[in-house]
Amino acid sequence: MAVASDFYLRYYVGHKGKFGHEFLEFEFRPDGKLRYANNSNYKNDVMIRKEAYVHKSVMEELKRIIDDSEITKEDDALWPPPDRVGRQELEIVIGDEHISFTTSKIGSLIDVNQSKDPEGLRVFYYLVQDLKCLVFSLIGLHFKIKPI
């Protein structure tokens, strides 16, 4: 596994629509800082921004999740490009590897299975689900808020 200074992760999902630019974004920086932003203008909701530092054990678990997913072996060339429905971005620096993925929003596994690269997109889909679950848990526990 890479040392903490060789690790960075950023995820973004969003779209511009009826309620403006709505998005969810989070990042883990090498020093353990977790930055979280959730912007929904639905019913004049306000943007939620939170920052917290996580323990090195959380960073190690994050790296383990990424390693286990084998996302670094994937390529987004055949994935659906961002469209009017929205876009997703995932950027990871782990050790000497720097990978970045961009695709459209994925509604369900049906979208994954109908893509040109269902195996690769499935890896991305499940990794994103795991990352969102971890981040929502960390934010919810730390700040006692409902992140969705």
UniProtKB/Swiss-Prot annotation:
Q: Sites of the modification N-acetylalanine?
A: A2
- Report any one BP term from Gene Ontology: nuclear-transcribed mRNA catabolic process, nonsense-mediated decay
State which tissues express it.
Ubiquitous.
Q: Which UniProt keywords apply?
A: Acetylation, mRNA processing, mRNA splicing, mRNA transport, Nucleus, RNA-binding, Spliceosome, Transport
Q: Which domain of life is it from?
A: Eukaryota
Its localization reads: Nucleus
Q: Supply the InterPro entries for this chain.
A: Mago_nashi (IPR004023), Mago_nashi_sf (IPR036605)
The subunit structure is:
Component of the pre-catalytic, catalytic and post-catalytic spliceosome complexes. Heterodimer with RBM8A. Core component of the mRNA splicing-dependent exon junction complex (EJC); the core complex contains CASC3, EIF4A3, MAGOH or MAGOHB, and RBM8A.
UniProt name for this protein: Protein mago nashi homolog 2
Q: Which gene encodes it?
A: MAGOHB
